[in-house]
Amino acid sequence: FAVAFAAPIDDEDDKIVGGYECRKNSASYQASLQSGYHFCGGSLISSTWVVSAAHCYKSRIQVRLGEHNIAVNEGTEQFIDSVKVIMHPSYNSRNLDNDIMLIKLSKPASLNSYVSTVALPSSCASSGTRCLVSGWGNLSGSSSNYPDTLRCLDLPILSSSSCNSAYPGQITSNMFCAGFMEGGKDSCQGDSGGPVVCNGQLQGVVSWGYGCAQRNKPGVYTKVCNYRSWISSTMSSN
């Protein structure tokens, strides 16, 4: 049993398979988490806070905002170091329950047309909702092929029955599945921690899966709507 995404990119991380290159700066809330290299994604939810996955934890992270091609300087980037990295207190590294983390930036990001925040969910999203996942993760489920430019994939939230049948006994109430049971399109290594945005709200964080884009093995995402109170209380107390 191989968990594909449940490690930052230097081990085995998560990436977009079967997607397309995002329109430049169209996902302006997307962050690249770096420690000398890109290892996970994140989402800017305020000028000073980024949401990612707890399995992406490092004590010191450089957050890169306004990025499209992470290999070159495009003039729109903001590089800001973390001052606090806060894993969810109930994160379970064995089953990846509560796979969510907050990063406080050392200074506020400047919000503009290249760097913007994404709204937290006003309510949970129902199955069938169409969403956008993005990241710089692996383009292939079978080999290593990491893109320089941000990739996007439109995908639906799957029913909890489909999710539970794909991963019996492994899906908690803090997870949901999204993608395509027939395979071929999925997030993958290097996408971990990145956004799943539905109707302008951050509903998911890229968490784990079995391989990438495999038949009957959709991607599994942290259910952000369950964490609104933890996010707001953590931000206000830090």
Swiss-Prot record:
It holds the Pfam family Trypsin. SMART domains: Tryp_SPc (SM00020). It is found in: Secreted, Extracellular space. The active site is at H55 (charge relay system), D99 (charge relay system), S192 (charge relay system). Its main location: secreted. Residues 16-236 form the Peptidase S1 domain. One of its GO terms (biological process) is proteolysis. Binds 1 Ca(2+) ion per subunit. Keywords: Calcium, Digestion, Disulfide bond, Hydrolase, Metal-binding, Protease, Secreted, Serine protease, Signal, Zymogen. GO terms for molecular function: metal ion binding; serine-type endopeptidase activity. Gene3D superfamilies: Trypsin-like serine proteases. It comes from the Eukaryota. Its EC number is 3.4.21.4. Ca(2+) binds at E67, N69, V72, E77. It catalyses: Preferential cleavage: Arg-|-Xaa, Lys-|-Xaa. Residues 8-15 form a propeptide. The keyword Protease applies. Its cofactor is Ca(2+). The keyword Protease applies. The record marks D186 as: Required for specificity. InterPro entries: Peptidase_S1_PA, Peptidase_S1_PA_chymotrypsin, Peptidase_S1A, Serine_Proteases_S1, Trypsin_dom, TRYPSIN_HIS, TRYPSIN_SER. Residues 1-7 form the signal peptide. Belongs to the peptidase S1 family. PANTHER family: RIKEN CDNA 2210010C04 GENE, TRYPSIN-RELATED. This is Trypsin-3.
